[in-house]
Amino acid sequence: MNLWTKIFQPPRHIKEISDPELVKKQYKYWRVRIFYSMFFGYVFFYFTRKSFTFAMPTLIADLGFDKAQLGIIGSTLYITYGISKFVSGVMSDQSNPRYFMATGLIITGLSNIFFGLSSTVPLFVLFWGINGWFQGWGWPPCARLLTHWYSKSERGTWWSVWSTSHNIGGALIPVLTGIAIDYAGWRGAMFIPGIICIIMGFILIDRLRDTPQSLGLPAIEKFKKEDLSHPHEETTADILEEEAERELSTKEILFTYVLSNKWLWFLSFASFFIYVVRMAVNDWSALYLIETKNYSTVKANLCVSLFEIGGLFGMLLAGWLSDTISKGKRGPMNVVFSLGLLFSILGLWGTHDRSIWWADGAFLFIIGFFLFGPQMMIGLAAAELSHKKAAGTASGFTGWFAYFGAAFAGYPLGKVAQDWGWHGFFVALLACALIALLFFLPTWNASEQSLRKHSH
């Protein structure tokens, strides 16, 4: 047994509890405990992921770096995080989420502390790259827990509520770093999130567990007595038996259901450009407001918090509208929201010569609203528009493109802002939003049925 297996191996299933009342009571308790633990755990991952973003303006003043150098540091995280998201997904499937998620959070905390102790670009790149790799340990264990503890019929609701942890983390970190900078400079803005996340990592070890079966509880489908049949498929028993008999080969997943799936290519390219806009607004808008409108760090960061809060509402509404108005098709809402994104970016750019902080905050709120809807639904649509046995690979495929887009928002956009000023920056954002819209358009009527016609 190697060290990895010894530390991270999932616990064995234990004998199932026979008392139905005790099972019900235990399930209720553990579902609540597991959910709040992974929810707040992921909020804290955001603290160590975004600390540098909001420490940037003060770091420029202290160390004299230019935007291109800062862009290199920012891009490093997105590249290592993008690769890790895929690799860690495979690793996490064979690991106990209790230790996997906690270890990731503790190491991101340490990376932030070492970053705060550094003063040169190579060291910043090293520690921010390590941070990016272990940031990839946050999402996969949550996916495992959401799948094991919440049944198919309710998972959408739990998934959307869990997804708001991104926005809550994103909204809190500007405030936390703003206060830390006022009292302890940019280094304090790295130390404080780092220390908090190390503490939270140990709390996760205490609070989280693996599957229901590891606690003597039945599988969630058995507990919920859920009929897993699908309107387009044969009976549940037939399906389960067929799936047990034959898994798809890696070749089938990649070449039949992912690489040859036109919908995934459209979604992946859209994902690239949506993520350029998302990360550009998140990473550069505070600096834009400070440089062009002379806002204080706290006021600029408050405006960026509104971007995340807008995203929270947009995400929940987009999912609900795609279920009700467009009957489960994600394409129409992706197109409508992308159109709204174009106009809201134009609105923010239109206020460049006026310093009205509430107007800037309102436009950032609206941009977040229209951006986070399609960003959330790309992964959902990718999973739905591929074979169920290829859903993870399909989501990972769009995720790779997303984080290449995020990396593009670092050095390349930093260079654009450096050479062509903030007007050039906004032109680049508008171009990306328009291209994303064009890639969403062909997916307007995409559905499982249209995939079958395409595949056969």
Curated annotation (Swiss-Prot):
InterPro entries: MFS, MFS_dom, MFS_trans_sf, OPA_Antiporter, Sugar-P_transporter_CS, Sugar_P_transporter. Its main location: membrane. It is a multi-pass membrane protein. One of its GO terms (molecular function) is glucose 6-phosphate:phosphate antiporter activity. One of its GO terms (biological process) is phosphate ion transmembrane transport. The keyword Cell membrane applies. Keywords: Cell membrane, Membrane, Sugar transport, Transmembrane, Transmembrane helix, Transport. It comes from the Bacteria. It is found in: Cell membrane. Belongs to the major facilitator superfamily. Organophosphate:Pi antiporter (OPA) (TC 2.A.1.4) family. This is Probable hexose phosphate transport protein. The lineage of its organism: Bacteria, Pseudomonadati, Chlamydiota, Chlamydiia, Chlamydiales.
